[in-house]
Structures are given as structure tokens and as C-alpha cells.
Swiss-Prot record:
Its main location: cytoplasm. It comes from Clavibacter michiganensis subsp. michiganensis (strain NCPPB 382). It comes from the Bacteria. HAMAP family: EF_P. GO terms for cellular component: cytoplasm. This is Elongation factor P. Pathway: Protein biosynthesis; polypeptide chain elongation. Gene3D superfamilies: 2.30.30.30, Nucleic acid-binding proteins (2.40.50.140). It holds the Pfam family EFP. InterPro entries: Elong-fact-P_C, NA-bd_OB-fold, Rib_uL2_dom2, Transl_elong_fac_P/YeiP, Transl_elong_KOW-like, Transl_elong_P/YeiP_cen, Transl_elong_P/YeiP_CS, Transl_elongation_fac_P. One of its GO terms (biological process) is peptide biosynthetic process.
Length: 187
């Protein structure tokens, strides 16, 4: 048993017999009344996100999660197949378990998979990835100095907002947590 002081982003909690991972947390000490911890947790199996509040000092049940290196192999319908890079075992995760990470994963990309009792829970990506723009509207001559953006489709099929001067075939760095354009990559 742990207490609410142990709550951090990424901690896996066992609530009502289900595993939930902490997405956001905030310790609140109001001027009147006792302190509490406000959290946003995500069900690791269904992907459902809910707000949950705990009284400060309350006992919570945490679960040990093993994070191991895997390689993303391919998508099979609504499932995603990964290979453990140490022993070459393959596991399959559902689209709900993979979540928004599917928008930034390329085949043969190295990822981290969180495991609990040998079963895959969710995928963790690096903070940013490099992707190639596969489609975007061409920029106009006067667009280069303004700060506007336009939609662009990257090689995973996901659409992001990029500056007007970027063209098809350009490699860009994308934040995997927010989906924001971070910069152009030059080789």
C-alpha cells in the first residue's frame, strides 16, 4: 500500500479491480478544509479517462509495472503487434491500449511497452519523433514570412499543423505527447 504522496504521472493504480495509469495529478491545499489530490487517470485496457480525487494521506494500491524495449512490427486490423528486442517474443495490444501513440508509430520503430504480470498494458514513445510529410497543400509565394499554419499529413496517416512554407517530402520533428510540430529536420 502506498499513500497519495506517491502519486506521479505514469504510476499505475489498482482501483476497483482494474488498472489505471495516472495522466495528470495536482496536490491541492485549500485555505479551508483538508488537502487532497486531484488526478486524471486512464484505464489501461479500455482507454477511458476519468477524474478521480483522493484525500491527502489516503492509502492507495499501486501496481508494479515493468517497462521493456519492444519493436513495433505491424498493425493487424484494430490490433498492433510488437516484438520484444531481448527474446524476440511477440505481443499484441489493442487500439485502446496503444492510444494516441498509433499516430506516431512507424513499422520497425523502437518503443517502450509497459508490462504487468507479463501482459502488455500500454505503449510509451520518445518525447518526439521524426516523420515525413506525405501530403500538404503547396505554399504560396507570400506565405513565407507570415506565422500561419496549414494541415499536413505525415507518413503514419495522422494530420498535424505545420508552417506554411513546408512542402511534401519534408522531414519534421513532432511532439508525441501533444502532436505539435517542433521543427524541420535537415540531414
Amino acid at each position: 500500500m502506498a499513500s497519495t504522496a506517491d502519486i506521479k504521472n505514469g504510476v499505475v493504480l489498482n482501483m476497483d479491480g482494474q488498472l489505471w495509469t495516472v495522466i495528470e495529478f495536482q496536490h491541492v491545499k485549500p485555505g479551508k478544509g483538508g488537502a487532497f489530490v486531484r488526478t486524471k487517470v486512464k484505464n489501461v485496457m479500455s482507454g477511458k479517462v476519468v477524474d478521480r480525487t483522493f484525500n491527502a494521506g489516503a492509502k492507495i494500491e499501486t501496481e508494479t509495472v515493468d517497462r521493456r524495449d519492444f519493436q513495433y512490427l505491424y498493425a493487424d486490423g484494430e490490433n498492433f503487434v510488437f516484438m520484444d528486442t531481448s527474446d524476440y517474443d511477440q505481443i499484441t495490444l489493442s487500439a485502446a491500449q496503444v492510444g494516441d501513440a498509433k499516430n506516431f508509430m512507424l513499422e520497425n520503430q523502437d518503443v517502450t511497452v509497459a508490462l504487468h504480470n507479463g501482459e502488455g498494458l500500454y505503449v510509451e514513445l520518445p518525447a518526439s519523433v521524426v516523420l515525413t510529410i506525405t501530403y500538404t497543400e503547396p505554399g504560396l509565394q507570400g506565405d513565407r514570412s507570415t506565422g500561419g499554419t496549414k494541415p499536413a499529413t505525415v507518413e503514419t496517416g495522422h494530420q498535424i499543423q505545420v508552417p506554411l512554407f513546408l512542402e511534401q517530402g519534408t522531414r519534421v520533428k513532432v511532439d508525441t505527447r501533444t502532436g505539435d510540430y517542433l521543427g524541420r529536420v535537415t540531414d
